[in-house]
Amino acid sequence: MNTVRVTFLLVFVLAVSLGQADKDENRMEMQEKTEQGKSYLDFAENLLLQKLEELEAKLLEEDSEESRNSRQKRCIGEGVPCDENDPRCCSGLVCLKPTLHGIWYKSHYCYKK
C-alpha cells in the first residue's frame, strides 16, 4: 500500500512539473500566434482590396464603353422634315431635297443614304 502511495505521489509530481508549461513560454507562444494571425489578416485584407479595385476598374470601363457606344438621343427619322443647315437626321439618313416637289413639302427631308 505504501508503494502504491509513493508511486502515485511520484507520478503526480512528475506530471505537475513536466506537464505545466512556463508562463513566459505560454505568453510568447500566444504573441507569435497573434502576430501570425495578424499577418494572415493583413494578407487577406490586401488580397480583397486588390480584387475590389479590379472590379471597380472593370465597372468604370463598362460605363465609359456604354457612353461611347450609346445611340443618338434626339434625331430625325426617315421622311421627316429637316433643316439643310442643321441636319439632325439619325445615322444612316441624309437631309435631301425631295424628288417630288410640291407646295406642301418643306424644302428638305431625311432619306436613306
Curated annotation (Swiss-Prot):
This is U11-theraphotoxin-Hhn1j. Probable ion channel inhibitor. The presence of a 'disulfide through disulfide knot' structurally defines this protein as a knottin. It holds the Pfam family Toxin_22. Residues 60-83 are annotated as: Disordered. Belongs to the neurotoxin 14 (magi-1) family. 01 (HNTX-16) subfamily. It comes from Cyriopagopus hainanus. Disulfide bonds join C75-C90, C82-C95, C89-C110. Coiled coil: none annotated. The keyword DNA damage does not apply. Residues 22-74 form a propeptide. GO terms for cellular component: extracellular region. The keyword Magnesium does not apply. Residues 60-69 have a biased composition (Basic and acidic residues). Keywords: Disulfide bond, Ion channel impairing toxin, Knottin, Secreted, Signal, Toxin. It is found in: Secreted. InterPro entries: Toxin_22 (IPR012627). Its main location: secreted. Expressed by the venom gland. GO terms for molecular function: sodium channel inhibitor activity; toxin activity. Residues 1-21 form the signal peptide.
